[in-house]
Amino acid sequence: MSFLPQVMGAGVGFNAGTMLFQLVAMLILLALLKKYALGPLLNIMKEREDYITGEISSAEKKNEEAKKLIEEQQALLKEAREESQSLIENAKKLGEQQKDEIIKAARQEAERMKESARSEIVKERDQAVTALREQVASLSVMIASKVIEKELDEQAQEKLIQDYLKEVGESR
């Protein structure tokens, strides 16, 4: 069932002029709405879309810049770690070298002291031997002079040697 036959059948007349006027009015109204309402609304929506696109693009650029900065910071941090590790290694090597030098110097000093002590011992031993030789020589001369002074028999000579040895033992 169609609406048009019912309206016509109800005694309402169909007027083509009115319908044409309403159609033209409707088209004018649509044109005005498009120009003054829909056009600015679409322009606002387009501007909003452009603004959002720009903001997204700006955010992506900032995100990329942040990533680059993070990568740069990580590279700098890695470089700093490598440099500090290198400094630590150099300090360890220097410490080892200094330790070796100190040990070497201490060994050389100990060897020098041992040599000095050895030469001192040899010197004192030589002095003691020289002094002992001098004493033996003087004792020999003294014994010989006493023997020569007295022509003694064997018993008297033995007694003289024993007395002399006692005398030497007491003088020490």
Swiss-Prot record:
Main location: membrane
Gene3D superfamilies for the chain: F1F0 ATP synthase subunit B, membrane domain (1.20.5.620)
GO cellular component, one term: plasma membrane
UniProt xrefs under PANTHER family: ATP SYNTHASE SUBUNIT B, ATP SYNTHASE SUBUNIT B', CHLOROPLASTIC
GO molecular function, one term: proton-transporting ATPase activity, rotational mechanism
Similarity field: Belongs to the ATPase B chain family.
Keywords (A to Z) from UniProt: ATP synthesis, Cell membrane, CF(0), Hydrogen ion transport, Ion transport, Membrane, Transmembrane, Transmembrane helix, Transport
Membrane topology according to the record: Single-pass membrane protein
Subcellular location field: Cell membrane
Domain of life: Bacteria
Gene from which this protein is expressed: atpF
Protein name, as recorded: ATP synthase subunit b
Presence of keyword Zinc: no
TM spans (from-to): 12-32
Quaternary assembly: F-type ATPases have 2 components, F(1) - the catalytic core - and F(0) - the membrane proton channel. F(1) has five subunits: alpha(3), beta(3), gamma(1), delta(1), epsilon(1). F(0) has three main subunits: a(1), b(2) and c(10-14). The alpha and beta chains form an alternating ring which encloses part of the gamma chain. F(1) is attached to F(0) by a central stalk formed by the gamma and epsilon chains, while a peripheral stalk is formed by the delta and b chains.
Species per Swiss-Prot/TrEMBL record: Bacillus licheniformis (strain ATCC 14580 / DSM 13 / JCM 2505 / CCUG 7422 / NBRC 12200 / NCIMB 9375 / NCTC 10341 / NRRL NRS-1264 / Gibson 46)
Family annotation (HAMAP family): ATP_synth_b_bprime
Keyword hit for Ligase: no
InterPro entries hit by this protein: ATP_synth_B-like_membr_sf (IPR028987), ATP_synth_b/b'su_bac/chlpt (IPR002146), ATP_synth_F0_bsu_bac (IPR005864), ATP_synthase_B_chain (IPR050059)
Function summary: F(1)F(0) ATP synthase produces ATP from ADP in the presence of a proton or sodium gradient. F-type ATPases consist of two structural domains, F(1) containing the extramembraneous catalytic core and F(0) containing the membrane proton channel, linked together by a central stalk and a peripheral stalk. During catalysis, ATP synthesis in the catalytic domain of F(1) is coupled via a rotary mechanism of the central stalk subunits to proton translocation.
